[in-house]
């Protein structure tokens, strides 16, 4: 008895009309932040802090915590890049601004600060469009996390119309 190679089995199944149900979990469709918007958010955040006299870094991560853009202003300490990224990652993990998370979950702050890539500090702000979480922006380098967060929010305000209409 001769066995059919796998390709022939598939051809026979296809021609016979056998179908396989597709589950919603088989294919994912998601909204995520594009490079151009990420770049412009980071730029606006750095410029907002610069207007206030602060040299900062801004990092935009996508909804999975992957870095899309990282900018360090002239004069910003090199460590601000890592801190900004960790703030953005914390925001993505919690799906709330890092400052709000810090206030509401001080009980687990020490443990989270030991997880590589996360830090529980003010300065991470979520990026939302049409109800979708697109990612987060983290800012570091101003004297105090609340000032970092203000620069991130100013960037999002400056690009609000573009962000709101990003999801069609």
Regions found by a protein language model. Give the residues of each.
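Bacterial N-terminal signal peptides that target proteins for export
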Residues: 1-11
């Amino acid at each position: 008895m001769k066995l059919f190679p796998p390709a022939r089995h598939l051809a026979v199944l296809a021609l016979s009309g056998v179908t396989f149900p597709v589950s919603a979990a088989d294919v994912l469709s998601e909204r995520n932040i594009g490079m151009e918007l990420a770049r412009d958010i980071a730029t606006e955040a750095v410029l907002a802090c610069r207007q206030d006299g602060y040299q900062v870094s801004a990092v935009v991560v996508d909804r999975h915590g992957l870095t899309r853009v990282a900018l360090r202003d002239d004069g910003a300490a090199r460590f601000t890049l890592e801190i900004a990224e960790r703030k953005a990652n914390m925001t993505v993990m919690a799906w709330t601004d890092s400052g709000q998370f810090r206030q509401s979950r001080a009980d687990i702050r020490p443990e989270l600060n030991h997880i590589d890539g996360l830090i529980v500090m003010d300065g991470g702000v979520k990026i939302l469009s049409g109800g979708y979480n697109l990612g987060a922006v983290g800012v570091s380098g101003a004297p105090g996390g609340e000032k970092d967060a203000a620069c991130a929010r100013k960037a999002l305000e400056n690009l609000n119309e573009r962000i709101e209409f990003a999801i069609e």
